[in-house]
């Protein structure tokens, strides 16, 4: 698209005349907002109106969200949780929501400050990579779908071994994917194991496919004390498509050779029948999936930076995941500084940023939200909605550039109108003089 403007309604003619005299009119505002009432927000404690505490603080002082929105029915939020955390771990909140314009303000509840590792000598950096890949896919798909929810994935395993929880740290225990223990009749982990699972009821599903990226030692009962290279895949029984990958790193789970941890890829799968296959080590099966329903016309999601005050370590994985054209990232330039609750809740600038949810705007773009659809000094990049006409800044005042055709037509019509007015004035003046002469 060039920097020419689409013809506007006649009422904007005055704006055309005055735009060179006005500087800074209808600039983009750094807020998250919506074009109409068809929106939804996914959040954590900073937008959780149901959180209850008895510490003498003012009511709802932990919110960055305006309390007027608490009863809007357009928010799914849980203190201490996030979509990533609920997707992978037993600490689960059933995030469910639907809207055309989707906003995310969560993610900080799984950050480097938690330092999660699957194994004692594991690597939290791998989990930060998992987080970035998860949100990148989630944002991309929610620019195309209205509805998000969680579903349980049923599976059938023909062996006698049971699920095992080998990936846990402090208060978090991984349960997606599910790990199946080694069958007792095998001496080591060099065997093929498989299980069937079914995906149904949604347009598409987001599921994890994970491997321990490195050399995994078998159990203490393994007489050979062998190390294994993890290999996992999902096979679509209906279509014949295979998804899979192997571990590639030369790391282990010892103090001398640390770094072994779970690396996850995130897949978008269609409804159908699948087979999970492990060629070595533990079999993994998806136990939960994000259910995507109701396709919509492409509409970028808006993501608000989810971070702690600088006294606690944060990450930038949601910023890494939020990329054009499917995502607009919103942030403030200052350190997060909470108010009466604590330093991590109730930041003044983030409250301003989220105050845009109280009203509709005309246009949402990369630079922010535009209140009006008439004129702006900034061209809306990746604009959605009824976006303003372009106006370039030149010298000391803006110079408005419009599509020349409607401007020429307006000039012709204005010239004709002037000629008609002059003709009528002369006609009535001549008519008046004739009548005076006859009198």
Curated annotation (Swiss-Prot):
Intravirion side: 429-439
Region (Receptor binding): 133-281
Residue spans crossing the bilayer: 408-428
Disulfide bond positions: 49-70, 118-167, 202-291, 210-264, 322-327, 363-387
Alphabetic keyword roster: Disulfide bond, Glycoprotein, Hemagglutinin, Host cell membrane, Host membrane, Hydrolase, Membrane, Signal, Transmembrane, Transmembrane helix, Viral envelope protein, Virion
Entry's EC annotation: 3.1.1.53
Coiled coil (residue ranges): none
Region forming the signal peptide: 1-22
Location of this chain's protein in the cell: Virion membrane; Host cell membrane
Annotated spans, Esterase domain 1: 12-132
Protein name: Hemagglutinin-esterase
UniProt organism field: Rat coronavirus (strain 681) (RCV-SDAV)
Gene that produces this protein: HE
């Amino acid at each position: 698209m060039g920097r020419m403007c689409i013809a506007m309604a006649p009422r904007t003619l005055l704006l055309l005349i005055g735009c060179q005299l006005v500087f800074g009119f209808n600039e983009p505002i750094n807020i998250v907002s919506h074009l109409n009432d068809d929106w939804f927000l996914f959040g954590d404690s900073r937008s959780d109106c149901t959180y209850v505490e008895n510490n003498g603080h003012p009511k709802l002082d932990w919110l960055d969200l305006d309390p007027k929105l608490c009863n809007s029915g357009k928010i799914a939020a849980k203190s201490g949780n996030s979509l990533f955390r609920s997707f992978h771990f037993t600490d689960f909140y059933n995030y469910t929501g639907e809207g055309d314009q989707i906003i995310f303000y969560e993610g900080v509840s799984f950050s480097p400050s938690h330092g999660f590792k699957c194994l004692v000598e594991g690597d939290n950096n791998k989990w930060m990579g998992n987080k970035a890949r998860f949100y990148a896919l989630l944002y991309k798909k929610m620019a195309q779908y209205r509805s998000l929810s969680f579903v349980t994935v049923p599976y059938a395993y023909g062996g006698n071994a049971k699920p095992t929880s080998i990936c846990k740290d402090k208060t978090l225990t991984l349960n997606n994917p599910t790990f199946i223990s080694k069958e007792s009749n095998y001496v080591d982990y060099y065997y093929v194991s498989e299980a069937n699972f079914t995906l149904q009821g949604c347009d598409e599903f987001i599921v994890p496919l994970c491997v321990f990226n490195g050399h995994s030692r078998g159990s203490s009962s393994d007489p050979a004390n062998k190390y294994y290279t993890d290999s996992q895949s999902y096979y679509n029984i209906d279509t014949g498509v295979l998804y899979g990958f192997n571990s590639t790193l030369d790391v282990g789970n010892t103090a001398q050779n640390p770094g072994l941890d779970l690396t996850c890829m995130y897949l978008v799968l269609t409804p159908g029948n699948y087979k999970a296959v492990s060629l070595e080590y533990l079999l993994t099966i998806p136990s939960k999936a994000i259910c995507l329903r109701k396709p919509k016309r492409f509409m970028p999601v808006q993501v608000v930076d989810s971070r702690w005050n600088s006294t606690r370590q944060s990450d930038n994985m949601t910023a890494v995941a939020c990329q054009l054209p499917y995502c607009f990232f919103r942030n403030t330039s200052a350190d997060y500084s909470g108010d009466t609750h604590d330093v991590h809740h109730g930041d003044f600038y983030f409250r301003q940023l989220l105050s845009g949810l109280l009203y509709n705007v005309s246009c949402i773009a990369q630079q922010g939200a535009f209140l009006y659809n008439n004129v702006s000094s900034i061209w809306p990049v990746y604009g959605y909605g009824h976006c303003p006409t372009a106006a370039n800044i030149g010298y000391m005042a803006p110079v408005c550039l419009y599509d020349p055709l409607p401007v020429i037509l307006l000039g012709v019509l204005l010239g004709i109108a002037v000629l008609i007015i002059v003709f009528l004035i002369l006609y009535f003046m001549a008519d008046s003089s004739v009548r005076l002469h006859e009198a």
